[in-house]
């Protein structure tokens, strides 16, 4: 199990894969235990990635060194409790998101990013305020999200329930995506399977 209780950090990455890179090969990530994160009074521009896969990547589709993601599995329960948090950019919980100008695809060379969530996801956000006016300000919980300028192919399977209890204020550009898939891309979209229930309060 992984338990984190924190206050003021510019970014929090727990039990997942995160990358900001020009060229990078991602590896496998298996979370077999429970993940719990509790924060209060988080600073602005905070970037949360909890039990998930996140990438901000640039590369050339013809370059062998371009980003190549692999697999992420969460078998335990992922719980995130945020109170009085100020989040400037992103909140990702047990999902998959990519801001990428590189190809992420199925082929003999490139494996697709695959996220399997077998445990429950419980997300609580109270009085959280988004401060970034950009369109990348987002909440992604148990699903797929992408801003992609090239070919992309993802698989995401959510086998259990996703529970979200949230109260926040945000800019007009902010959006929330729970247990599904969303893409803003010049090419392919994604594959997403969700066999559990989604509850939003």
Task: Locate each region found by the language model.
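Surface-exposed loop/turn motifs in large extracellular/passenger domains
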Residues: 1-201
């Amino acid at each position: 199990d992984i338990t984190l209780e924190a206050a003021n950090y510019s970014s929090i990455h727990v039990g997942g894969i995160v990358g900001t890179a020009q060229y990078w090969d991602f590896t496998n990530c298996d979370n077999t235990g429970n993940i719990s994160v509790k924060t209060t009074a988080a600073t602005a521009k905070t970037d949360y990635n909890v039990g998930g896969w996140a990438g901000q990547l640039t590369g050339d589709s013809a370059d062998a060194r371009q980003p190549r993601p692999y697999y992420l599995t969460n078998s335990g329960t992922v719980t995130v409790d945020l109170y009085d948090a100020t989040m400037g950019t992103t909140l990702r919980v047990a999902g998959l998101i990519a801001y990428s100008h590189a190809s992420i695809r199925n082929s003999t060379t490139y494996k697709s990013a695959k996220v399997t969530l077998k445990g429950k996801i419980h997300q609580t956000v109270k009085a959280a305020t988004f401060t970034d006016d950009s369109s990348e300000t987002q909440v992604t919980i148990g699903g797929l999200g992408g801003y992609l300028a090239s070919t992309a192919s993802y698989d995401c399977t959510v086998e259990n329930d996703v529970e979200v209890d949230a109260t926040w204020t945000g800019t007009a550009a902010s959006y929330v995506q729970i247990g599904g898939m969303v893409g803003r891309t010049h090419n392919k979209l994604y594959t997403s399977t969700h066999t559990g229930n989604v509850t939003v309060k």
